[in-house]
Amino acid sequence: MKVYIATPYGFCSGVKKSISLAEKILSLKGEVYTLGALVHNPKVIEELSKKGIKVLGKDEIVEGKALIVRAHGLPQRDIDFYKSLGNEIYDATCPLVKKVQVLAEYLKNNKYKVIIIGEKNHPEVIGILSYTDNQGIVIEYESDIEKVEYYPKIGIVFQTTQSFDNAIQKVNLIMNKGKEIRIFNTICPETIERQEKAKKLSKIVDVALVLGGKNSANTRRLYITLSLKVPTYHIENLEEIDKNWFKEDSKVGIITGTSTPNNFVEEVLALLKSLYPLEIHLV
């Protein structure tokens, strides 16, 4: 069996920084909570929980604790609320997400109507929207654009894990909605690279495994890209893999979301190796 692994795989730089900060604060404080799931991968959250990094529930309120802002960021009002209760706040927001928040606030302050191309209910988008005083417009579907009024000044930013191709399609449809339109490409370069690798894999393999959390936006987009071309399976746990998907002469593609740990790739390879001898290629 030939296995083609898209590189890079494992955590992106933003996820690495977020987890590193959480572990550092845990070592200093002995107890730490994250405001929502630190990253969108249940396996990773479970491992962090075992170490003592706990996820604070939506309706849970704590005082005088060490709290970490998740990688996707938070609305500023939420951060201010937890600060008011005497908590120490440590910001693990991905630097690229932070950049989008700053841009959104800048555009709002300079009288631009801010348009965010992204998923309405995604934590990152909710956080970005808060920096427009919730006056921005979120475009998730092309049908959302029909409702957009004409504005003298429009500023466009993107959820960092958006598909580049889909984002550009939406931008083209927005171009007649304003006189002055400023576009900031805030899609994460690492996300774009993985999307391109997914396209490349789809031309090589006859079955693909996308490894990562089912709640991960960037992982879902990798799945969509590959599934348009080849049989594709989104795998969150090893138990989900069915050996009947493979044959000895299969060409299997493996790609990971940005919050998928390296050791999960190794576990999947070990399982495949137990079925057939492997010939591994990096793509």
Swiss-Prot record:
Q: Please list the residues that bind isopentenyl diphosphate.
A: 40, 72, 122, 216, 218, 259
Provide the protein name. Answer: 4-hydroxy-3-methylbut-2-enyl diphosphate reductase
Residues involved in (2E)-4-hydroxy-3-methylbut-2-enyl diphosphate binding: 40, 72, 122, 160, 216, 218, 259
Q: Which gene encodes it?
A: ispH
Give the GO biological process terms.
Answer: dimethylallyl diphosphate biosynthetic process; isopentenyl diphosphate biosynthetic process, methylerythritol 4-phosphate pathway; terpenoid biosynthetic process
Mention one GO molecular function: 4-hydroxy-3-methylbut-2-enyl diphosphate reductase activity
Q: Which domain of life is it from?
A: Bacteria
Gene3D superfamilies in alphabetical order: 3.40.50.11270, 4-hydroxy-3-methylbut-2-enyl diphosphate reductase, catalytic domain (3.40.1010.20)
User: Its function?
Assistant: Catalyzes the conversion of 1-hydroxy-2-methyl-2-(E)-butenyl 4-diphosphate (HMBPP) into a mixture of isopentenyl diphosphate (IPP) and dimethylallyl diphosphate (DMAPP). Acts in the terminal step of the DOXP/MEP pathway for isoprenoid precursor biosynthesis.
Binding annotation for dimethylallyl diphosphate: 40, 72, 122, 216, 218, 259
Arranged from A to Z, the UniProt key words for this protein are:
4Fe-4S, Iron, Iron-sulfur, Isoprene biosynthesis, Metal-binding, Oxidoreductase
EC number(s) per entry: 1.17.7.4
What's any one GO cellular component for it? Answer: cytosol
Per the UniProt record, the lineage of the source organism begins with: Bacteria, Pseudomonadati, Dictyoglomota, Dictyoglomia, Dictyoglomales
According to the record, how does the cofactor bind? Binds 1 [4Fe-4S] cluster per subunit.
Per its record, the protein catalyses: isopentenyl diphosphate + 2 oxidized [2Fe-2S]-[ferredoxin] + H2O = (2E)-4-hydroxy-3-methylbut-2-enyl diphosphate + 2 reduced [2Fe-2S]-[ferredoxin] + 2 H(+); dimethylallyl diphosphate + 2 oxidized [2Fe-2S]-[ferredoxin] + H2O = (2E)-4-hydroxy-3-methylbut-2-enyl diphosphate + 2 reduced [2Fe-2S]-[ferredoxin] + 2 H(+)
What InterPro entries does the record point to?
A: LytB/IspH (IPR003451)
Q: Which organism is it from?
A: Dictyoglomus turgidum (strain DSM 6724 / Z-1310)
**Which cofactors are reported in the record for this sequence?**
[4Fe-4S] cluster
Catalytic positions are 124
Question: Where, by residue number, does [4Fe-4S] cluster bind?
Answer: 12, 94, 188
- EC supergroup of this enzyme: oxidoreductase
Listed NCBIfam families: ispH_lytB
Recorded metabolic or biological pathway in which this protein acts: Isoprenoid biosynthesis; dimethylallyl diphosphate biosynthesis; dimethylallyl diphosphate from (2E)-4-hydroxy-3-methylbutenyl diphosphate: step 1/1; Isoprenoid biosynthesis; isopentenyl diphosphate biosynthesis via DXP pathway; isopentenyl diphosphate from 1-deoxy-D-xylulose 5-phosphate: step 6/6
